[in-house]
Amino acid sequence: MPENEAKIRLDRFLANKLPEYSRSRLQQLVRTGFVRLNGATTRPRHLVRSGDKIELTEAPLEKIDNQPEPIPLEVLFEDKDIIVINKPPGLVVHPGAGHRQHTLVNALLSHCPTLSGIGGKERPGIVHRLDKETSGCLVVAKNDGAHRELSRQFAERRVEKIYLALVAGKLSKEAGVIEEKIGRHPVHRQRMSVASARGRPAKTDYRVVCSGDQASLVECRLYSGRTHQIRVHLHHLGNPVLGDKVYAAQLAKNFPRHMLHAWKLGF
């Protein structure tokens, strides 16, 4: 354990070093004894220290037990290693609490029965995510080699991620950079905030594509991937995404969902 990386949670340390694994998957490996700290089992929240020895035993890949569902998919690109999907709004990416069926994973298993198992049984092939109501480009790994390579590129911030957002009002500048840190809201735990004392670095470039009296179309380029990053940063500017029930509920009633689309994905 290098001294400059000491005193952080074990699961966070592992997530930084092993981007191909989701944090929930790593927490599961710690709890089930596949990760040992100084030869002993431990807990995901244990704070690692300089000089600690961490051992990870490769766990067998989990058998995928989600059921295929014939949900139509718009495939933008596909080869033997990856699939790029234009995800529709309203579709949850992977099964979780409250969404055990009718997800993108169920649709993918119908389209392509073999997917990478690195993400665990609930997230086969899933390398990154989009919020339920966000539409647009999402890449999925068909095999473990593709999963590891894509995860590495995302972790190294080499993936180009460009979004289009329809926001309220006119922006004060035609283009700019937002670098406010983002963390969990101190009171509303389902929200993220730039006011969090434990915020993590986040960077969003933006450019106004066109604007009218009441709304603007904005192109946003992400250099990090914090939860709700674009929605939080644009809300911070005073130009929230239209239709956003979480950050601008008063402006959401006339829209079926928040107006955010993952336009381009380059890797």
Label every PLM stretch briefly.
Residues 1-267:
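RNA pseudouridine synthases
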